[in-house]
Amino acid sequence: MISLLQAYISQLKFDGFALMSDMVYVTQSAARLMRAIYEMVLAHNWAQLADKALALCKMIDRRMWQSMSPLRQFKKIPVEVVKKIEKKNFPFSRLYDLGPNEIGELIRMPKLGRAIHKYIHQFPKLDLISHIQPITRSTLSIDLTLTPDFQWDDKIHGHSQGFWIFVEDVDSEIVLHHEFFLLKKTFCEDEHTVKMFVPIFEPLPPQYFIRVVSDRWLGSETVLPVSFR
């Protein structure tokens, strides 16, 4: 079954009735089962396992591996173009710093530079700012401001985009708080504030981590350290 799941994500094709029959089961059930596993892991507050489970959910949905370029999720970009970017080993985050002409030069296709630049800036991305305040010796209040930093396109993003907000301990092993944040198209240019209450322990740790991860897009993640020093 693991091999079939890997083949499904890799978009491999099989010959033979038995394998094709098993692949139908994987196609129909894998995403649903993985979502259930993710919810179970999250209920136990296991941060690293939850991160891996959510990533695998998205790999199944997108039929691509996490190691691939996030640009593969834009179906209008030719695969050959994405492969060129992947072969460059150019970090996706650094593509934001390039203009259309520079992107065209990078892939040696000047005419496609503007289109690729547009897709890069349509990739779901949120900027984060936090304000913390102790409430009691064991409770901390966090006001998290989320600001969308991408260009909305109805054909790509629909009417809303979902994100998971995690507050993790200093070792990123325990989820101290989690909630689902739904960004609607109507408010895609506005700042949004989420108020959270999380436990604190003695001795006081140096910091917590806030991670905001897209529910559907591989590679869409923002991490904000919250220092207590």
Give residue spans per PLM region:
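Beta-rich interaction modules in large eukaryotic scaffold/regulatory proteins
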Residues: 98, 105-152, 156-206, 212-229
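C-terminal helical accessory/scaffold domains
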Residues: 1-81, 86-87, 91-92, 96-97, ...
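Extended, compositionally simple hydrophobic/Ser/Thr-rich segments
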Residues: 82, 104-105
